[in-house]
Amino acid sequence: MKLKTRILPFESAHYTVVLDQSVAKKLDVRPSDRVLVRFNGKTVVAIANIAKEFSHEHVGVYVNIAKALGISDGDEVEVEATSPPASLQAIRKKLQGLSLESDEIYQVVKDIVDGKLSELELAAFVTAVHFQGMTPSEIYSFTLSMVETGQRLRLKRKPILDKHSLGGVPGDKTSLLVVPIIASLGFTIPKTSSRAITSAAGTADRMEVLAPVNLSIDEIERIVEKTNACLVWGGALNLAPADDIIIRVEYPLGIDPFYIPSILAKKLAVGSTHVVLDVPTGRGTKVKTLEEAKRISQSFFEIARMFGMNLQAVATYAEEPIGHAIGPALEAREALIALRELRPGDLVDKAASLAGTLLEMVGVENGYETAMEALRTGKAEKKLREIIEAQGGDPDVTPEEIPLGDKTYTLYSEEDGFVYYIDNSLLANIGKIAGAPIDKGAGVYIHVKLGEKVRKGDPLLTVYSSSSAKLQAVERILEDSKPVLVGRTAGRRMLLERIQYQPPRQLVLER
């Protein structure tokens, strides 16, 4: 059936069209059935929404279909009913608790990327994987399929180093130090990062204060060839695109069953050969104990080895924010200060520990000291400024030139004592309520660290925002909640333990 297009100002994870009920009846299409949309030799499979009072001469198409087919408003397209996607059978199989074969997994991932699965079908699949789990073979196949259904960065150099953090600790701007440290020593480290989802700033948000991060594959390859590195947003690159679609379903459900293929697929897509996996460990983070950190790391080791990837996991101290700053502009400022002045100490220590681990993975002796030397000599700072310039930013920017929110609120200590507890999740939430990361100048500056002595009236934290209303919302929260508590605590080290791979033990049943 030939219909004229009406482009609707909506976009979804899957392709969607709107048909009048009279048109749907002629096509024998019911709600959520699939239709084939054809235009100028191109086709997409879309999910049909049925409307009661829509033009019977038109088909409503979402923006992503218009982009995929090159459609303009009023163009004539061919619409016909088509069969359900092949991957539905695999989804039903997983719901029954059965393992999937590699070809079934590829079909599921392909249908996700092609927009053939509805959000309901995708949610059912994600939930099934969450409750049924995956075998190592399934995780391997999902990782491989995610890579194969997206673009890849093809750099003509080896080795390629990389880092990834499981997150959960506020203010973790270590990538802004680790990347230039590694690159300044002649190694390649193309860092693709995410924007904040549940935190006040992701690495891409922090770097965007200093330079554009929404770059193409060609631009990234050129920048890496010139500087050995980049710090860019991965969401613009179509690397493992199935992951971005799955995350949209995982987030409202509060589950994350694909975290291993998600992380490894994006590392494989940029060609990473050596990866340090940062596992922040402590109260208020995703990983609470060293035992849990070791268990999670073993799963990563097993899958990484299947791909020939050299992966080293490290559990890092995460009982408090890294450094003092939370929020894009505040953290970008602090990263520049750390590169020049080697403070705050915990940020510098963690960055040198992660960079040092990577360096030792490629044969450099005394990795930590080598990383510190790159900081002390100014090589790392110079390299970051080269990367900033290559990505289109101002290489001469100073911390003081980075604007912050002009509305502030400071919380003061009500007593003498020692800081004995800092609530990571509450601080991250305060940063978001203040407007971060959308408001780049919003965030929280923590004046104190665990174990520090404070006097009554000393500042504990300052909140920045560009909105008076948002700052007032923060003040109301701080009337009832205390993100910083006073008491006594012991000292701490940033690097808790390097976790070693352990071959799986054979299970022997007693007879």
Swiss-Prot record:
Gene3D superfamilies: 1.20.970.50, 2.40.40.20, Nucleoside phosphorylase/phosphoribosyltransferase catalytic domain (3.40.1030.10), Pyrimidine nucleoside phosphorylase-like, C-terminal domain (3.90.1170.30). Catalyzes the conversion of AMP and phosphate to adenine and ribose 1,5-bisphosphate (R15P). Exhibits phosphorylase activity toward CMP and UMP in addition to AMP. Functions in an archaeal AMP degradation pathway, together with R15P isomerase and RubisCO. GO terms for biological process: AMP catabolic process; pyrimidine deoxyribonucleoside metabolic process; pyrimidine nucleobase metabolic process. Disulfide bonds: none annotated. Its EC number is 2.4.2.57. One of its GO terms (cellular component) is cytosol. Belongs to the thymidine/pyrimidine-nucleoside phosphorylase family. Type 2 subfamily. The keyword Transferase applies. InterPro entries: AMP_phosphorylase (IPR017713), Glycosyl_Trfase_fam3 (IPR000312), Glycosyl_Trfase_fam3_N_dom (IPR017459), Glycosyl_Trfase_fam3_N_dom_sf (IPR036320), Nuc_phospho_transferase (IPR035902), PYNP-like_C_sf (IPR036566), PYNP_C (IPR013102), Pyrmidine_PPase_CS (IPR017872). Pfam families: Glycos_trans_3N, Glycos_transf_3, PYNP_C. It is an enzyme of class 2 (transferase). The active site is at 256 (proton donor). It comes from Thermofilum pendens (strain DSM 2475 / Hrk 5). Keywords: Glycosyltransferase, Transferase. It comes from the Archaea. This is AMP phosphorylase. One of its GO terms (molecular function) is 1,4-alpha-oligoglucan phosphorylase activity.
